């Protein structure tokens, strides 16, 4: 269906256009945005969910909600920190889906590329338009052909949120090798999950409603270095560190599930 969005334009979007895993993130960001004291705000996500006009509450259970809010805050803050050090960096949101990180962290000088598979970018263009410093681009995380269209830069910052957790170990290796081969130096912000989650996709409170399953899980980001020795692990933070700030359940999960929850790992090469 079509409904007006910002600027009076219309969003021509159907429920089937959106991958199930993307619905999880969209539903959570939309519902959080609608709260009076929202910790994150994503008006575009709310517009998308409102346009679809369907019940997506099953994709918004408590723990997944808190996890997505936490990772959104953690990615945003880490990106701002890196951009403050490299204000002219080229930033690439690889596997961007409907994510709108550019508006959260833009400093007025970065160049930003939202990259995803062609079918996903085609749907994204129903929602977003290219801007002077924020461009959408077809690209595969397992094939670096697209990287030749990325301009030269003194620093590259690659964001992969909710992507690598669905890859096999071989696919993770292919992706890491591709990044290091394609860009002479850079940072990678990656979402990692545990071996426990790899084995229990169908027990996940939101993913169980999709056909998706988690791929290779790790106990530490150091395991990535075995696949790509050119990379160094700069930092690794469990989402529990953010989630425990907001609720008793979050604080309890930080204790009983400290080795289960996902992490934000930062790599450099």
Regions found by a protein language model. Give the residues of each.
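Rossmann-like AdoMet
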Residues: 2-92, 96-139, 152
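Short amphipathic alpha-helix with an adjacent loop that forms part of the alpha/beta core around
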Residues: 144-154
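A conserved beta-strand element that flanks and buttresses the S-adenosyl-L-methionine
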Residues: 158-159
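A short, conserved alpha-helix within the catalytic core of class I
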Residues: 166-178
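Conserved beta-strand signature within the Rossmann-like core of class I S-adenosyl-L-methionine
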Residues: 182-195
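Short, glycine-/aromatic-enriched active-site segment of Class I SAM-dependent methyltransferases
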Residues: 195-212
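Short alpha-helix
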Residues: 212-238
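Core SAM-dependent methyltransferase catalytic element
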Residues: 247-269
